[in-house]
């Protein structure tokens, strides 16, 4: 007796439907694709009970003729492709001819449609079988009404989430379609309540309309680029709106949302200079790619894609984002006046190493004034009290001579303190800013017009040092004794091997000796004594872009040398930090953290019911 049998036609259709339609949002996606492909410029969506009870979509597109309406719900019927070659140049969102047949087999489906100048016709299908076909009062376009989803798929229905969760999934699909088609009016109603309305607008405005709430209606940054076969637009949020997961990294290829790890990683890499580890950007990537260089016929829901002859794409995305932030940084730094600082850091690069014995250096011992003593590490018997009655009061003993550590030398590089009078005002005017004092030995309080700034002293000092380091001139320095090291991960080995030439651009010479074994031969002069940091970076390489090494290294140096929390600092040094903060318009430390928090007078008064 034969064990292999032909499956019943209805069973085959149910299996196929289960692949294409897994929940209400899948139906919404397919029906929106059809409405968009019809040329509609107005689409309305109605959802009830998460789409399980009902999904109704109306559009003003080209409509479906009487003859086509009779067969449109049958398996593998489509108007979008005719032959095999059409799969190589897909111009529409749908093309397989599976959507309506899959929907019809797992729900009650009613379609009403008309073409221009013709009568409307209506067809109802239940469990994949036509229930009736009749003439209907005229409408403009098409109306698709799906009810009782999975009523004949009890197993599938049991795995659906609560109505509220299914509604959120439908909303996500609706937003993805709306943001990729800004030339269409979209409306969404949930349980008879109007939820979303988007009118025709530019892509930039549509991104702002759909996703602006995520960044509290701040403006997205924008990048546009064009290459052979590819047009690229990138919209990204300010760094302080970063997230702890990747959910707000969205990629659209030819107006389809896709899941592509290499492109997602390239976006993360592009933000690696400004975001801390495990913080992810809010970013939306739109790619328009020649249809001969992309294949969507992979995933049942078209979530995956293959690219042909576009190896440059991931790296170009990273580079574009990096260049954007570099340009932004240069605009800020063009007013950077402290050229002497950069020259001194360049000439005395060896001083960037705490391992150096400064006793044997060319630096002399320093006479310590009261204000300088506040910058230095305080001996145990030195006590400094808070500002009291508009005066600084010192208690205990201050050493008269002190040999500065590397940390203090860095501070002297950034500000030359002078003798401070015994008495000074509690609130000291700095240009148009008023310095109010230090809070918790961690924050600088500054009044500016009708605003109060709480500035993180460590983050601010770190950013100032970092900008000086990153912009100082560097030369390549050959190691007297090259260092050999091994990487354990094969993926890391492949990455390093492919990027050896790229490292030379940042003055790092590393050569591969054998499989997973390398030799570090040269580094930038400013990185002397920090070979271990570079090697550790090599060993932990995953997919970061090459120039993140420079950024990460100097960010680490700056972090180590900046003043810390619980460091009490002088009035002059505080003034210096505040002036740099406002002059350079600094917002984030090299690791992406906010440097300050601001409260307006209005907000403060409102908090105590003064408004």
Swiss-Prot record:
InterPro entries: DNA_mismatch_repair_CS, DNA_mismatch_repair_MutL, DNA_mismatch_S5_2-like, HATPase_C_sf, MutL/Mlh/PMS, MutL/Mlh/Pms-like, MutL_C, MutL_C_dimsub. Keywords: DNA damage, DNA repair. GO terms for cellular component: mismatch repair complex. It comes from the Bacteria. PROSITE patterns: DNA_MISMATCH_REPAIR_1. GO terms for molecular function: ATP binding; ATP hydrolysis activity; ATP-dependent DNA damage sensor activity; mismatched DNA binding. GO terms for biological process: mismatch repair. This protein is involved in the repair of mismatches in DNA. It is required for dam-dependent methyl-directed DNA mismatch repair. May act as a 'molecular matchmaker', a protein that promotes the formation of a stable complex between two or more DNA-binding proteins in an ATP-dependent manner without itself being part of a final effector complex. This is DNA mismatch repair protein MutL.
